[in-house]
Regions:
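Conserved beta-strand signature within the Rossmann-like core of class I S-adenosyl-L-methionine
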Residues: 153-160
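C-terminal alpha-helical "lid/dimerization" subdomain adjacent to the S-adenosyl-L-methionine
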Residues: 162-218, 228
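A short acidic, Gly/Pro-enriched loop at the edge of an enzyme's catalytic core
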Residues: 114-125
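A short SAM/SAH-binding and catalytic strip from SAM-dependent methyltransferases
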Residues: 124-138
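Core SAM-dependent methyltransferase catalytic element
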Residues: 222-247
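Class I SAM-dependent methyltransferase SAM/SAH-binding core
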Residues: 57-115
Length: 247
């Protein structure tokens, strides 16, 4: 298979696009607030695992306002293609790319992770952030991400997680159920209140259905080897990375 089939949006895609459509203007500031200041540190770890290989051609999926894409371009000197469902997020991302002086090395386009419009082995590295909770079939999505990665290339991801320590898990539960919605309303209005109210239950339900062992198995089934998992900030986030096996 040299390219994905024509894109067909799912209910999960439509929900994600609607949830984030009103957020771009203050997304980056509020993402830091709602992650208790950890989003930038998590992102740095993700980028580090890709930049170590000095890839020349990188795909960043669920790129949002292009924060990861910009960091990758700066750290690697390579070209970055960013893909996201939400055009308003991409519009804000293009503003940020231009402000960073990186228009010649970063291209942002609308697209779906489940059906990427790229040929097999098109990229030296692939990153994705906060993605799998918004797709219908995480395993198939991981396989599609691996399809466009060249053999030997790095696949890396970042997402929220649920702490395993009981005390930290209780604190996380209170933070995601009470603090996040209130902080979202206080700093970002109704749109961010919706996101704050949604995130905690969504994260919990996703990892009940898709524990890390199952996610790692999906990476391996897609041909990714040497998969590593690094919980961040006492388990509030998780970074994963691995390499596509050579044929």
């Amino acid at each position: 298979m040299n390219a994905a089939r024509p894109s067909t949006a799912t209910a999960e895609n439509a929900f994600a696009a609607d949830l984030f459509a009103g957020l771009p203007k203050r997304y980056d500031l509020l993402a830091e607030i709602l992650s208790f200041g950890q989003n930038g540190r998590w992102r740095w770890r993700l980028v580090t695992h890709i930049a170590a290989d000095e890839p020349k051609k990188i795909l960043d999926v669920a790129t949002g306002t292009a924060g990861v894409a910009i960091a990758l371009a700066r750290r690697t000197g390579g070209s970055v293609t960013g893909v996201d469902l939400t055009e308003s997020m991409l519009a804000r991302g293009r503003e940020r790319v231009s402000a960073a002086g990186l228009d010649d090395r970063i291209n942002l386009q609308t697209g779906r992770a489940e059906e990427l419009p790229f040929s097999n082995a098109s990229f030296d590295a692939v990153s994705f952030t906060y993605l799998l909770r918004y797709v219908n079939d995480p395993a198939a999505t991981i396989a599609e991400l691996a399809r466009v990665l060249r053999p030997g290339g790095v696949l890396a991801s970042l997402d929220f997680f649920v702490p395993t320590n009981p005390a930290w898990r209780a604190a996380w539960w209170f933070y995601t159920r009470a603090v996040l919605p209130a902080a979202g309303m206080a700093f970002g209005g109704t749109e961010w209140w919706r996101v704050g109210r949604f995130l905690g239950p969504n994260i919990s339900s996703f990892y009940r259905a898709w524990p890390l062992t199952r996610i790692v198995a999906a990476w391996e089934a897609a041909g990714i080897v040497d998969v590593r998992v690094s919980p961040m900030s006492v388990g509030g986030g998780v970074v994963m990375w691995g390499r596509k096996a050579h044929a």
